[in-house]
Design a protein with these regions (language model features):
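TOPRIM metal-binding catalytic domain and adjacent DNA-binding surface shared by DnaG-type primases
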Residues: 1-31, 186
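Residue-level preference for alpha-helix termini and adjacent loops
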Residues: 7, 15-16, 55, 64-66, ...
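Phosphate-handling DNA/RNA-contact segment within nucleic-acid enzymes
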Residues: 23-118
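Exposed loop/turn and edge beta-strand positions of beta-sandwich/beta-sheet ligand-binding modules
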Residues: 27-29, 121, 156, 217
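TOPRIM fold recognition
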Residues: 74, 90-187
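Generic beta-sheet signal
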Residues: 75-79, 125, 221
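The Walker A/P-loop phosphate-binding site
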Residues: 187-222
Length: 222
């Protein structure tokens, strides 16, 4: 399903199959996407039907731990669904394992806020939600909910979502898979700079009249 119908590259699906983050449901042959906590313990599972629009979070799942990949870099790429995440990796493969990628399982903020809390190394967040009004509205809301200190950008896919871009990859001969990149939706507060003056730059002058004559009990008003 993922490779034939969704056109996800085999090296990408194989990577997550080997980790146990994607598997096939034996009973219904659904694709199941697993989300883990920082210790690698499964805390979430989403079942996606290979035919029709069936999708379901497995009972007991914690949406704070959605399907993701944790890299050691400072960048986090955020998507609505696991298939969007996988599609993006196919389109932008170079060095992808260095950075982090997160599916929200929709447009809620729970997984994003938990991920940022667990990963203080993240400095820059790329919101890669669908290129439609719902995706734009969700991005605006997520930016407001995120803590201060992050740089946030918005990447809009050339088509409605990243899998649709992947489906048309052969037609996009110039390799430009973005409709638009909107930079600086949020920026860290700028630290106030204080000018340092070197003593060598200070013009000194001796003022004798201030000290003479000596007045032991009075004050001199200047």
């Amino acid at each position: 399903y993922l490779t034939a119908a969704r056109r996800i590259d085999e090296d990408v699906t194989g990577f997550f199959f080997a980790r146990g983050d994607i598997y096939e449901d034996a009973a219904h042959h659904n694709a199941v996407f697993v989300g883990r906590d920082e210790d690698g313990i499964p805390r979430y599972a989403h079942s996606k039907g290979t035919a029709g629009n069936f999708r379901l979070d497995v009972k007991g799942s914690d949406k704070a731990f959605n399907f993701c990949y944790r890299g050691e870099g400072e960048r986090l790429f955020v998507f609505e669904a696991p298939i969007d995440l996988l599609s993006f990796l196919c389109l932008f493969k170079k060095g992808w394992q260095k950075q982090s990628y997160l599916s929200l399982g929709g447009v809620g903020e729970k997984a994003l806020l938990r991920f940022l809390s667990d990963r203080p190394n993240i400095k820059t967040v790329y919101l890669c939600l669908d290129s439609d009004q719902a995706g734009n509205d969700a991005c605006s809301r997520l930016v407001k909910l995120m803590p201060e200190g992050y740089t946030v950008h918005r990447l809009l896919p050339l088509y409605k979502d990243w899998n649709e871009v992947l489906q048309h990859r052969a037609e996009i001969t110039d390799g430009k898979y973005l409709r638009e990149a909107i930079y600086g939706l949020k920026e860290p507060p700028q630290e106030e700079t204080v000018e340092i003056i070197r003593m060598s730059e200070v013009d000194t002058q001796t003022v004798e009249w201030l000290w003479e004559p000596y007045i032991p009990f009075g004050k001199v008003t200047i």
